Curated annotation (Swiss-Prot):
This is Homeobox protein orthopedia. It is found in: Nucleus. CDD domains: homeodomain (cd00086). It comes from Saccoglossus kowalevskii. Residues 55-66, 239-249, 278-293 have a biased composition (Polar residues). InterPro entries: HD, Homeobox_CS, Homeodomain-like_sf, HTH_motif, OAR_dom, OTP_Homeobox. One of its GO terms (molecular function) is DNA-binding transcription factor activity, RNA polymerase II-specific. Keywords: Developmental protein, DNA-binding, Homeobox, Nucleus.
């Protein structure tokens, strides 16, 4: 008993923390602390594991998403820069003009095709449009007008579409019709005068009976009275008419079987009471081909003499009919 009490006294007297109760309490506290620490360590490990899982899963996804987001941002930045570099294409709005506006614009276009800035502004105020719209309308209208004018000029000039053969117009007077037509067309061969003789021409009954000799049909070699050969086309041919009634033989060209009507100069002059003049009227055309024996006679005459003689012959014929 004494030993136990001594032992207790020794422990309690020396230091209260060195007693068994205190030591036991300290041991329990240490155990509790160690348990708490171990529990805390376990909790930390669990938390670390959870963080690692989260980092493997969600955090990485966040990083990847942030990375993608960064890439998207960079791409968007590049696109914005490229869009800033390229000018934005504006949508073109087609202007619809009312009939009243078109009438006003057409009326001003009839006045001038090139209005100045002041006139365009005045027109824009009247029709309720902008000056730029009015300017564009005038530009389009001028282009349309030039195109239409060009087309009309092309259709008006037939020489631009088809070649011109340069055929002269038929003259009105008898002398011009006999002598002024010249051509180098040699497609038709010459025909003798005997083959071109046609049926006799008849005169209306109103003319006197003494003029019936005009309608007689005579060939170039058989006719006794001098006259004039006439083709249906109105072209003159090689004829030599003298006052004594002799007809020089000639070969001329006929288109589609011409009519040959020869009138007597002597009968015309006698019936009209005019003296017969010794004028030798000769009508020749470059289209006719003279016979070889009369070539020298035709070669010596000139165009001026032929026209003058043809005119005298026409005056003589007109005087005879009067």
């Amino acid at each position: 008993m004494e030993a136990a009490s001594l032992h207790v006294q020794m422990h309690t007297a020396s230091d209260p923390f060195l007693s068994h109760a205190a030591l036991n309490n300290n041991n329990t506290m240490n155990k509790l602390n160690s348990a708490v620490l171990s529990q805390g360590v376990k909790d930390e490990h669990d938390n670390n594991d959870k963080l690692s899982l989260d980092s493997d899963g969600t955090t990485l996804l966040k990083d990847t998403s942030s990375g993608h987001g960064g890439n998207d941002g960079s791409h968007m930045g590049c696109n914005q820069e490229s869009n800033d570099d390229k000018p934005l294409k504006q949508k073109r709005h087609r202007t619809r003009f009312t009939p009243a506006q078109l009438n006003e614009l057409e009326r001003n276009f009839a006045k001038t095709h090139y209005p100045d800035i002041f006139m365009r502004e005045e027109i824009a105020m009247r029709v309720g449009l902008t000056e730029s719209r009015v300017q564009v309308w005038f530009q389009n209208r001028r282009a349309k007008w030039k195109k239409r004018k060009k087309q009309t000029n092309v259709f008006r000039t037939p020489g631009a579409l088809m070649p011109s053969h340069g055929l002269p117009q038929f003259p009105s007077s008898m002398g011009d019709s006999l002598c002024s037509f010249h051509t180098n067309d040699t497609r038709w061969p010459p025909m003798p005068a005997q083959m071109t003789s046609g049926p006799p021409l008849t005169l209306p009954p109103t003319l006197p009976r003494q003029h019936t000799g005009i309608g007689q049909s005579l060939s170039g070699h058989q006719g006794g009275g001098g006259g004039m050969n006439q083709s249906p086309n109105g072209f003159g041919s090689g004829i030599s008419v003298t006052s004594n009634g002799s007809v020089q033989p000639s070969m001329y060209q006929s288109f589609g079987g011409g009519m040959s009507s020869m009138s007597s100069m002597s009968s015309v002059s006698t019936s009209s009471g005019l003296p017969s003049s010794p004028t030798n009227v000769t009508v020749n055309s470059p289209m006719s081909c003279s016979s070889p024996d009369t070539g020298d006679m035709w070669r010596g005459t000139s165009i001026a003499q032929l026209r003058r003689k043809a005119l005298e012959h026409s005056v003589t014929l007109n005087g005879g009919f009067r």
